[in-house]
Amino acid sequence: MRILNFILTRTVNVIPHEKLAAARKLVLQNCDFVVDIGANNGQWMSTVRNHGYNGKAICIEPLEKNYVKLKSVKFHNTVTMNCAVGNKNGYVYMNRASKDGESSSILELDDYHNIGAPDIKYIGKEKVRISKLSKILETNKHKKIFVKIDTQGYEFEVLKSINKSNFNDIYAFEIEANLVSTYKNSTLIEDLIKYLRGKGYQPLRIENGFGMPNFGQQLQVDILFVKK
């Protein structure tokens, strides 16, 4: 863990929220379409609109209760979609988490999550539709897409659902990444970075996310990637 922190802090900046927000705002000026995967109640999209982005967007949220709240917000120039995103088309069962469902995932909680947030529990399962991102973007005509992925350990399955044509059109990613296994069978940060570097993207900024400060352990970070 110390080695990984050493590498990260010397290749990209680990910075407070307002600085990542400033970087995101600059990147959005070069984008003509925003895809919000794991939109929850629309919190992140609200931030994007507050940045001054007025272009087209889609918010994607799988859980029905959260989707109803999301749809009621009625963001300007934004469509909504009630489904999960992953490397298959069909249906899956999703674990619904307590506290407004922000930790809900297709994957099971792992020990680090249970220790870091003992008040978060799964309270049921919900059958949801799942679609590849390539299918969602199959009629896309935009050439500078910003994709945000917050899928609680399922991020790599979303990335694998993107085809070559989509990658040509995607300018930036913002991804929640795990430094340790907070969800069972989740992909860790080093593999996400390696994969996206191989697709022609580089990390621009890293922001601290979920952690256990009393133990000195960071669990998750948000990473902003841009095309080289």
What is each of the regions a protein language model found here?
Residues 1-228:
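Phosphate/nucleotide-binding beta-alpha loop and adjacent structural elements of enzyme active sites
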